[in-house]
């Protein structure tokens, strides 16, 4: 972790007070499984926290920066910024993958550059940063790494199928859209998910993805295209 600490200090002016917390953020579930460590020793709990922190900072930035945009437009922009591919690219730009502690099997299968793994790593780092130094430092880091891309409109045109489906259905009147994860397959470090989307209790489509977010987006996409099958 010493090299990681040096990188964070040199690139972002960050010095973690709790090195064990930083180590946890960079520990994949495949590593804890192989080393027979407790499940809470991997970065999944920090990922959960970082996801919320990221969403809040991005939402606040978009709200203040685009006073002319309606809620639906802001939701589309936020969704495109925090989608799997975007967060994986942010993680790559920070060079985080190099420092991730992976199990040998996951390493051999290319897990170090897997999109969902890098997405989760980026969120876990934000969660650790929040605990260690508070929301102000999380905001500064996001403004340094993420916001420049938002200013360039890099993510405005990315399709968010969940929001698009909601807009299509709302034209017909009152609607209640829900998503449900129907199936989880594969080992903990290489999960696949099948999601279904419903409108007022009626199933509209299903989707397959390497994360719950991706599966739900695929289900919404298939619903829009009228394809009620898994793909």
UniProtKB/Swiss-Prot annotation:
Domain RNase III: 5-134
Chemical reaction(s) catalysed: Endonucleolytic cleavage to 5'-phosphomonoester
Recorded superkingdom: Bacteria
Keywords: Cytoplasm, Endonuclease, Hydrolase, Magnesium, Metal-binding, mRNA processing, Nuclease, RNA-binding, rRNA processing, rRNA-binding, tRNA processing
First-tier enzyme category under EC: hydrolase
InterPro entries, per the entry: dsRBD_dom (IPR014720), RNase_III (IPR011907), RNase_III_dom (IPR000999), RNase_III_sf (IPR036389)
Example GO biological process: rRNA processing
Subcellular location: Cytoplasm
Record HAMAP family: RNase_III
Protein family membership: Belongs to the ribonuclease III family.
Protein's recorded name: Ribonuclease 3
């Amino acid at each position: 972790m010493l090299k990681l600490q040096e990188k964070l200090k040199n690139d972002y002016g960050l010095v973690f007070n709790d090195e064990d917390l930083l180590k946890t953020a960079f520990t994949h579930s495949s590593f804890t499984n192989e080393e027979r460590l407790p499940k809470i020793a991997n970065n999944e709990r920090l990922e959960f926290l970082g996801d919320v922190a990221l969403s809040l900072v991005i939402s606040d930035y978009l709200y203040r920066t685009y006073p002319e945009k309606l809620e639906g437009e802001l939701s589309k922009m936020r969704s495109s910024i925090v989608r799997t591919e975007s967060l994986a690219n942010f993680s790559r730009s920070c060079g985080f993958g190099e420092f991730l502690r992976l199990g040998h099997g996951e390493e051999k299968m290319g897990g170090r550059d897997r999109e969902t793994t890098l997405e989760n790593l980026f969120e876990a780092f934000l969660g650790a940063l929040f605990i260690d130094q508070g929301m102000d430092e999380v905001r500064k880091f996001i403004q340094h790494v993420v916001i420049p891309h938002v200013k360039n409109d890099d993510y405005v045109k990315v399709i968010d199928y969940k929001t698009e489906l909601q807009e299509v259905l709302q034209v017909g009147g009152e609607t209640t859209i829900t998503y449900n994860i129907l199936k989880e397959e594969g080992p903990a470090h290489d999960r696949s998910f099948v999601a279904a989307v419903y409108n007022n209790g009626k199933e509209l489509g299903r989707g397959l993805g390497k994360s719950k977010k991706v599966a739900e987006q695929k289900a919404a996409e298939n619903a829009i295209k009228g394809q009620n099958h898994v793909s």
